[in-house]
Amino acid sequence: MLISTPSRNLRPGRLQPPALDALGQRSLNRRSLFKAAGAVGAAALIPLTACSSPASATGVTTIRFMQNKPEVIGYFNQVIKDFEALNPDIHVVQDSNEGNFVPSLVRNDPPDVMTRGYAQATADFTRKGIFADLSGLPAASTIDPKVQGLVNSWGQYNGNETSALPFSLAAAGVIYNRDLFAAHGVQVPTTWNEFVAACNTFKAAGIAPIYGTYKDHWTIQQGAFDYVAGGTLDVQGFFTAINAKGADISSASRESFTSNFGAVLPKILEVAGFAQPGAASKNYADGNAAFGKGQAAMYLQGPWALSELVKANKDIRLGMFPLPVSNNPEDAKVRVNVDMALLIARNTPRMEAAQRFVSYLLQPAVVNAFNEKNAAFSTLKDAAVTSNPQITGLAPFVKEGRYYQGAGTYFPPAVPVGNYLQAFVYGKDGNKFLADLDAEWRRVAERTAI
């Protein structure tokens, strides 16, 4: 299996956009990852050293909580304050520097409780046995099984452990300007033909149908690439198969990109072609400013962009819908990722305190308030439908489990899919694009084969 590096995933609300490597995923080099994985593999069954005693002389147990979003430090400070008031025998120290995670593994001193974006990177650590099995916590039974399935789809330690409990689910789609749609009599499209017709209506009116920011290649990757691929293919099934093929992959293989992604490419180009002139010279910041000012009808971005658009125009009325890529409305699906998952270090000597804190974080009042505030979706079974009008268009799809995890999240950073996508959108050579992906995948598989 290809091994990717630790990362940030899509971020909701006022959070920052993905960075340039693998959709904003904060990465470490392969040497650091393998060193950490090796250290954990050797130390997984060794108790943590006595330098971290379970409780102080006062009877108060201090636990370290590393969460993956510096932008929500204030929220968690209040949550911790409330928790400590109810649990005076536990003190929680918040750490928002996720870059300390791998060094802490090498030192055999990981944080007691963590939140991490959950995809290939975190799953690599799960498979090494770093995280405790949380299936026995009563709170585990409150998680929506469909959302828990997203976590489990990346693999489980010992094949059956529940190493992470989802806390926040982010959904991305097509952001649209409600006022422009209303002014031109355009309804939210539910089929591919309706989407193309909407684009042509705006184009005829002199309005850019889509604001493209192709100078930042990650915006092509998480946008047109992920949306079209996710709505067309069984993304998870494809990457399971190509991982199993390993270094034996070639363009002629049944499991290859060439054999599977050919049908996706024409629609990626068609979507890209509806962008404004000069999209190749515009970046994400340009797009936020321009779309906020009403210079386009649609924007292929995720929830992290919403607050930036409102910042550019406080009166803008926004909505979101999944990009339809077939002419059957029932085929429509939305791109999601587990933006925050809760984990406990397997060898923490403060397990009871850590479990109490995780159980508190998964109370509906905590989970639901966080997600409502940050334009994300609750991971709980019985959560109320979001009241945020910016994302209500995605809510039915999330509720029904009509979603996929983006194809871009399955690539290790060693495969520069964003660069190849950018070259494809500019040069329109689909055969070369797919052959390049097959060759890159094979090279990385050869280097990481163990």
Set out the residue ranges of the language-model regions.
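Extracytoplasmic/periplasmic solute-binding protein
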Residues: 161-167, 196-250
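N-terminal secretory signal peptides and thylakoid transit peptides that target proteins
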Residues: 18-40
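Conserved C-terminal helix/tail region of periplasmic/extracytoplasmic solute-binding proteins
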Residues: 2-3, 7, 13-24, 182, ...
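Short, well-ordered beta-strand elements
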Residues: 59-70, 90-95, 113, 163, ...
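C-terminal lobe and pocket-closing loops
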Residues: 124, 130, 302-315, 326-419, ...
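Hinge/lid segment of periplasmic solute-binding proteins
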Residues: 119-172, 196
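Glycine-centered hinge/linker elements that transmit conformational signals in sensory
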Residues: 201, 242-279
